[in-house]
Structures are given as C-alpha cells and as structure tokens.
Curated annotation (Swiss-Prot):
Oligomerizes as a right-handed, spiral filament on DNA at oriC. Disulfide bonds: none annotated. Its main location: cytoplasm. This is Chromosomal replication initiator protein DnaA. Keywords: ATP-binding, Cytoplasm, DNA replication, DNA-binding, Lipid-binding, Nucleotide-binding. It comes from Spiroplasma apis. Gene3D superfamilies: 1.10.1750.10, 1.10.8.60, P-loop containing nucleotide triphosphate hydrolases. One of its GO terms (molecular function) is DNA replication origin binding. PANTHER family: CHROMOSOMAL REPLICATION INITIATOR PROTEIN DNAA (PTHR30050:SF2). Plays an essential role in the initiation and regulation of chromosomal replication. ATP-DnaA binds to the origin of replication (oriC) to initiate formation of the DNA replication initiation complex once per cell cycle. Binds the DnaA box (a 9 base pair repeat at the origin) and separates the double-stranded (ds)DNA. Forms a right-handed helical filament on oriC DNA; dsDNA binds to the exterior of the filament while single-stranded (ss)DNA is stabiized in the filament's interior. SUPFAM superfamilies: P-loop containing nucleoside triphosphate hydrolases (SSF52540), TrpR-like (SSF48295).
Length: 263
C-alpha cells in the first residue's frame, strides 16, 4: 500500500548509517533513478557500464525504493541480479521496498524473486489510531500548528491510513490560515478543522456520526461495515471494531453503554 512510510523508512536507514562512524557507503535509489543510471551507462558503451558496475560494487548498503517498477526491465534486471549475488557473497546489505510480497511480483526473473524471498520480508502495517494521532501531532508541530486533542483524533480517524494524506491535511490547514491572512488560533478546535477542510476532496462532510466512523474504519481496514457489526472474531475485524469503538468514545463522547448499543 502507498502512504505507509516505506520511503521514509529507507531514508531513515540511510540517515542513521550516514551518522555512524563505521564509514559504510550507503546509497538510496528510487527504482526509476536506478534504472536510468543503468540504461544511460548501457547506451554509453562497454566501458561506461563496467564503470557503473564498479561504482555499485563499492556500496556497502544499497537501498532501492519501489522495486516493483523494475519489472520487465530486461538488461537492468540482469545487472541487478548479478549485483544482488555480489552483495550476498560479500556480506553487503540490500534493502528494498515494494507494494507487494516477492512471490506476488511479476516481470522478474524467477531467480531474482527467489533471492528476494531469501531475505527478511516485513509488512509495513497501517498505523493504529494511537500511532496515527502521534503522526498528526508531529506533522502539526513541524509547521507550528497547535491542534486540540479532538482535532488530532478527527484527522487520525479519517486519514490515518495514509501518511501522505495527513501531510496534505496539515498543509491545507496551514495554507488556509495564510490565505485568510489571519493568525492561527491558539488551539485549533474541531470546528476550525471542519471550516478549513470544507472544500478538501478527501474530507468527509457534515456531522460526524457512529455510522461515518464505521464507514471510514471499514474502508481503512479493507473490510465491510457489516463485518464490524458482526460477531466475527478474525484478528483484522476485531482490531477494526476496537478502533471504531475507541473513536466513537473519544470523538462523540459516548459512554460504554452507548458504545455497546452502537456495536
């Protein structure tokens, strides 16, 4: 899935390694940049491609973002396969991100997919509500916006499955304040958020209700509202149900009895 922070994690790895004293050579590529570097060197002839291979071989930690976009890349994949083997044989590290697991990747040599599968595969999960609230709080503080707790919960509940959307919301609020040529409220309340986002394409309009909370949570977790209302005990459904109940209590100020009736 997009917007979960895979690129941020790769850049954090590069930053952390760059700050250590072990003098490891770390290089971050987007898949398109990596392909372009290989294709450009291929077009410039044998000497240039050998020079590029030599440069890549001196890297200790190679980071490539969105590896799925290297599918059906022909010679680029062949060179990458040989580079991958070189890294394994020399105890170097490769970290890749993708929108799917190795066995779901199409357009790659089976040997390369096998190499991907041999490594540690970790799924980046959708942030839970507490993590999403912390992300909202962090992004707001960067631009000196002081959001009320209700405002943070509102943004996290409706947009917390995509960090890019959270950033977009914060940018929209900041821009609205600048556009109005007014000082930001000392504390930005939920009513202010609704005003700032009234023309925002992702923003749910109207009054917040239990049903709207269920709809948004169900969408974020890829399940139906009917599943939330059911007695099914599958882990993802239980988690979604608990998040919806939590938001109902926090945003709508419902007590336990009222939440029990709603769910």
């Amino acid at each position: 899935d997009s917007g979960l922070g895979k690129t941020h994690l790769l850049k954090a790895i590069a930053h952390e390694i760059g700050n250590t004293k072990n003098k490891l050579v770390v290089k971050y590529y987007t898949s398109s940049d990596f392909r372009k570097e290989i294709v450009d060197s291929l077009q410039d002839g044998f000497k240039e491609i050998e020079s590029t291979k030599e440069k890549l071989s001196k890297i200790d930690v190679l980071l490539i973002d969105d590896i799925q976009f290297l599918a059906n890349s022909g010679k680029t994949n062949e060179i990458f396969f040989n580079l991958f083997n070189f890294f394994i044989e020399n105890n170097k590290q490769i970290v890749l991100t993708s929108d799917k697991f190795p066995e779901q990747l199409n357009g790659f040599d089976k040997r390369l997919v096998s190499r991907f599968s041999q490594g540690l595969n970790v799924k980046v999960e959708t942030p839970d509500i507490i993590t999403a609230i912390n992300i909202v709080d962090y992004k707001a503080k960067i631009v000196n916006l002081n959001l009320s707790e209700e405002s943070k919960k509102y943004i996290a509940s409706f947009f917390g499955s995509d960090v890019r959307k959270i950033e977009g919301i914060i940018n929209k609020i900041e821009f609205s304040i600048i556009q109005d040529n007014s000082a930001a409220p000392k504390i930005i309340e939920l009513e202010d958020i609704n005003k700032f986002l009234e023309d925002y394409s992702f923003a749910p309009g109207g009054e917040i209700t239990v049903q709207k909370i269920k709809n948004v949570v169900a969408q974020n977790y890829g399940i139906s509202v009917k599943s939330i209302d059911s007695r099914l005990r599958m882990a993802n459904i239980v988690k979604a149900r608990h998040v919806a109940m939590f938001l109902t209590g926090e945003i709508l100020k419902k007590n336990y009895s009222e939440i029990g009736v709603a769910f």
